Amino acid sequence: MTLSATQIQAIVDATKTPTPEQVRVVEAPRRPLLVVAGAGSGKTETMSMRVLWLLANHPDVTPASILGLTFTRKAAGELGDRLRERIRLLSRELPQLSERLDEDPVTLTYNSFAERIVSEHGMRIGIDPDFSMLSEAGALDLMTQIVEAWPTDLDDDLSPAGVVGRILHLAGEIAEHGYTVESARQALEGFGRELEIVGDSNEAARDLHQANQRRIAFLGPIEVYQKRKREMGLLDFSDQLVLATRIVREVPSVRAALREEFRAVLLDEFQDTSVIQMELLSTLFGDHAVTAVGDPNQAIYGWRGASASSLETFLERFQTGAPEEGQTLTLSTAWRNDVSILEAANRVAEPLREVASYQAGKEQLNAQSPVLVPRPGAGRGVVEIAYPAAYEDALAATVDFVRRVRAQPVTDGKRRTVAVLSRRRKDFPLIDAALREAGIPTEIVGLGGLLDQPAVQDVRAALELGYDVAASPWLARLLAGIDLGAADLIALGDWARFLARAEGLNPHQAVLLDAVDRPPTPGWAD
């Protein structure tokens, strides 16, 4: 007996009917499949239904043989909960399958999956199975030791803490892009030779040349950092991916065992996978029952190695033969928004679908985000636009909008909630203060929130200074809190530079804390 997507939907939730797009995704053959899903298009529910369809129609697939990968622990937990709930419903309605469905699917972050491969199979490439994970704080401490002992200045324009942060960031970028220190050196030196041909004709060219030279200088500490980690039996997050990729590439038996263990694989937020993650997954699960879900319009991790071509090259990387019809599908029904809101969103996103000038004449991209269409029965909705000239008027318009929405009648006795989005994080406290002043309770979601409160900022300033005495902006915050005026702070800055010159240092390396510890005599003037 073969169950269709519509029949399975009726079993788990008879109030919903899958769209034709969802049916095509759910019932797709067991082969590499790319699903380009717009925002709010029900991708998680559709992926859950695909898992149920595979379980109901393929006896060799069990819940434990389903692998779901995503980027955060929270997302992995939510995906696991959704799958377990749906599997329980299917098992209850189809008793003949209950014994085979008495297991849980495996949902992990991409990094956790790599860590599992290394911990279980690392010995096959000479990795000690008792390795320890290096935390972010541990990485900072280790790199700080290396930088402080480095025989030459690595960057005159940055504080020691700034240098450490930049070097660790570059180390992560090298790993995420699949480079070694040596191959990165060759690439950067080659780029440097190209820059020499261009010359220092303008400020942008000079800045680019300087940045490239800085990266080359940072490679030395990175090389020592990696050596120290090996000697101490430590791995960081980037190491997990590099070593896991090496294992599946060099040990065919591991690759075969993992493919046998996981008969079906779901790759969530695939547009944000990095070069090294793509290499790991395509090496391991090429020509396998892999469903990758993503949306190029929601790519957010390009700064840390995410490949812009992840969606475009999915079938090329995961399939040896030519792609067939039906291997790239879309989900375009937006279940969250009314018609006018979708019209505005599609208009804003329209430039993202245009072919860039450097791609002119090439084949149209086949992994573009779909134009969203409203759900059946969607209302017209309302889009209001305010464009005040003054910032204070913009805040007032925001408060007025939130107040009007919260005043609308509701049926469940609860006030309507409102989300306020801002392009700039520094606007959060101002928006928050304006809403609170109007008597509207608020919560700042994500980073910030409590950390932005003045008292907490003062505590953080003291801690930052305890870690890095050169963190002058944090000291300036504390000094401003004891009623020192702008003229006083300027005078302290001048005195700090005077002390630096007296010690034979570059004035740009002046430390404001030195000026506070050894203040100038009354009447001093530079």
Question: Across the structure, where does each feature detected by a protein language model lie?
Answer:
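P-loop NTPase Walker
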Residues: 1-127, 133, 228, 252-256, ...
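Accessory N-terminal region flanking or inserted into the helicase ATPase core
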Residues: 1-36, 41, 45-46, 52, ...
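Conserved RecA-like helicase ATPase core segment
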Residues: 2-3, 7-10, 15, 48, ...
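Inter-lobe coupling/hinge region of RecA-like P-loop helicase motors
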Residues: 11-19, 23-27, 31-39, 64, ...
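Conserved RecA-like ASCE P-loop NTPase motor core of nucleic-acid helicases/translocases
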Residues: 62-75, 83, 105-107, 268, ...
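Conserved beta-strand -> loop -> alpha-helix junction used to position metal-binding or nucleic-acid-contacting
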Residues: 95-116, 134-135, 439-465
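ATP-hydrolysis module of ASCE/P-loop NTPase motor domains
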Residues: 100-104, 122-219, 230, 324-335, ...
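ATPase/helicase motor core of nucleic-acid motors
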Residues: 152, 317, 378-381, 407-526
